[in-house]
Amino acid sequence: MNLNKSNKFVVIDVETTGNRPQDGDRIIEIGLAVVWNGEVTKTASSFVSCDQEIPPFVSRLTGITKDDLIDAPSFSELAPRILDDLDGACLVAHHIDFDLQFLNNELERAGYESFQGNVLDTVEMARMLYPTLDGYRLASLAEQFNLVHDQPHRAGSDAEVTAHLLLLMKKKLYALPFVTLQQLEACTTDTFSGMQLCIYEAMKTVRTSHHKNDSSYAIYRDFALKKPQANNRTQAKVSIPFHAEHFFGKDGALSSISPSFEHRNGQVDMAENVHACFEDGKHLIVEAATGTGKTLAYLYPAVYKSRENEAPVVIATETVALQQQIKDRDVPLLEKGLGLPIEAAVLKGRSHYLCLQKFAHFLEQIRGARQASYDEQLSVAQLLIWLTETETGDVEELNLPNGGYALWEELKSDPESCTHSNCTFFSRCYYPRARDNARQADLIITNHALLLTDHFQETSTLPSYEHLVVDEAHHLEEAAGRHLGASMSYQHFMRLYNQFGVQENAGLFANISVVIDRHPTAVSADWPNERKQELQSLHYEWNQLFNALQTAIVKKDKRTRQKSEGYLPEDVVDTNVFDAWKRVEAGGKDVIRAWRSITRTLKKEALTPAEETLLQKVNTLCNDLEEAQSILASLLTSVENEVYWAESDANKRPDRLRLYRRPINISEQLSGKFFSNTKSIILTSATLTVKGSFQYTIDQLGLTDTQPKCLQLSSPFQYEKQAQLLVPEDFPEIRQDGEERFTEAVAQFLRSLTSSVNGRILVLCTSHQMVKAVSRMMKPHMQRLNYSLFAQGVNGDNRSKLVKQFRNQERSILMGTTTFWEGIDLPGEDVRALIIVRLPFAPPDDPVYMAKAKQIEASGGSAFSRLALPRAVLRFKQGFGRLIRTKRDRGLIFVLDKRIIQARYGKVFLRSLPTLPSVFAPSKELLARADEFFHDGKRP
């Protein structure tokens, strides 16, 4: 294959009756686009007659019906023209395996030979060349690159879009620096399609050019890196005035630079309170309802305090999405309002950052004895291209294949293997650069995990600071519990075991053997075999231990839905478990001792830089194994105020077992090591109060004796005009009428509601079983309703992808649980109706909840009123907040749980919501009301 500009590509796309040509599925439409001399010179498409029925789901997806095929030509009639176009061409498709198997099946049926020429997969090509995209579906790529795609899932349109995508990607490939192309060519030997040949042709072209594309990059030790931005920190930082009313006012700084900016009293109030607490050294809790503009309300006084003290203020969030919003949207807006630059740095834990030294060593390995898997080769290609684009080296920018995250464990930065200034890559290392940026910043944006690590482990990753804002503070207790707890699984041990490379003579064994051969007098020739036997023995004992744990902890009844099983270490550690653990403990120590010994021995020899890196990797792996054994020991040892539980898969397999421990109450730890050690902390979220009181939050976070200032800000939205809360009085109750009848009622109500809403509906459930059951009942009716259904766990688990698919369909239903109750922003027509299926009480078998409840009851309190109810109310408020996101939104909230009206505690939920019309009536009346609401001419 020759990929210069005179080359010929033929892009083919097929629509079919199914996915398996070997089982009789056939092509019903074929599209073709010819690319020649860097241009799309021909497009064509045709229906294809076949003797198979078109399944309803195919018709829904493509719009193709059996009537379209009545006068269509057979494939044998089309074949001569297709083969003529393919003559001498490279065949291209988006998911080449799918299209090629159907094309070859039809060619052979028509009496022709299958296609034997070069092929190219644009999915594989896109994954390599654009490693940071959220997804690689053709429609997503077309949207990303502004390619016209009028008819998705139609062969002609798909083929033409794929052709233009090919040209775009070819242009990017040929613009890559020569050193990157060299590295890519060496590490893509097992790609599915012709990517290595593409890269080779690009290398030949780029090699003959004068500049080799390299001048735009920082070329360092065979890596092409994005040039770091120039450091303009030559001038002293300018102090800023603080005047919230002026800054956020109707004629203030923000309104002058943003026409859409709206003055909000709550925003001014919050900014002034944050400023006052920073000045006075006090803690503040702020519940800022949706629409108050809380982010800017704390960023403005935070920058003021940073400039005044010449020290950074830390902003900690739970989610990556909010960190990116602050960095990319809110800080730039604040800069415009202030008229001066603000230095904001994102800092995460060390394991988020790539270690260039480790990556260079890995590339040496796969050019030598190590056989890289397909996922590893794809990931390496992604990383090489990403290095030309990234400023941060943060893994969260990447969209790696599944196997790529195992590779990341080998390549991430860690303190054990880091040689700091002795490392040849130190001046280019991402982690020290991130820390340096943080030290110079006005604002340090980080996550709850790193924040808590700094406080409880005293790692000092973050620079010294006195003022802190914790956004998404309703997650802080859970994050602290996770941090102070621990977990260990069989799979974690297997990942460590596989890094040694015992089975495939790869990994550490392959590399250490090479080093031993170079230094035969230092180490016995029998050393590798002895170590393999030790590791195989440890692997066997680990299996025995988890089999014993599974027997001791997990219930044998596979029909049970219970995901978690609580346990007490003293009850579990019977003779079998205890003996197995002691053998694992001893075996692990033997392995660690032997491998550390060889590193000490070899360090006395004259080593190459690659060998030194290998020994660092050995030490890191030994440390990881030692830590894993220590964690497992803690999970088998009882500690007061700790809860222990195990989770497994539906089949209760020992190799899927994971053990957990968590503090029951973390209020004392937070009070003693978190709030006491920081001068002023601002806690903020949209959901911190229950029935107007902050007491639950204060108790959970250990602030009872601190007496923080509390501020509750209502939303500027007019809920009484924008929304209604509707509860059907004739709905069955799950406890009285059974889960099956309740689920059927949910599905029936949802089907009836679609005609009234005529738009997007978000359905929030409290269990995955409910999502799957309702989805199953809805599926046969979706074509008749002209609706699309996207259900968590049915159509995938990736929340962002499901939300994107939901938004792309005007008539669609999105069903989810847990993570869908918060953190998704669906303004305007993105969602017109919200259904809360049940009040979101925690599952009664949740181990942490059970332990907390038991502790409360033992002290004479009510677990329901002090724990279950407040938790449920806060989650309910989070779900409620998904509907109205702007002043222009309108929508309906349906609660299908009559307890909100009938139970004595129902009023606690209602009083925690903003004032809005609430109606408790028969389902038919509510559906009629919905029809009137959406068709009364008052749509936004």
Label every PLM stretch briefly.
Residues N2-N118, P131-H153:
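Conserved non-catalytic scaffold segment of RNase H-like nuclease domains
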Residues N2-N4, L168-P241, E245-H246:
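Acidic two-metal-ion nuclease catalytic site recognized across multiple nuclease folds
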Residues A224-A230, P241-G252, E310-P312, A316-D442, ...:
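A substrate-engagement module of RecA-like helicase motors
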Residues V238-I285:
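Conserved pre-motif I regulatory segment
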Residues E279-P301:
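Walker A/P-loop
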Residues Q324, P415-L443, N447-A586, L688-Q700:
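Signature of the SF2 helicase/ATPase Hel1-core->accessory helical subdomain module
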Residues E409-D442, L452, Q457-T459, G588-F731, ...:
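A contiguous, basic/glycine-rich beta-loop/short-helix subdomain that forms a polymer-engagement track
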Residues F717, P728-R741, G793-I900:
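Conserved RecA-like P-loop NTPase helicase motor core
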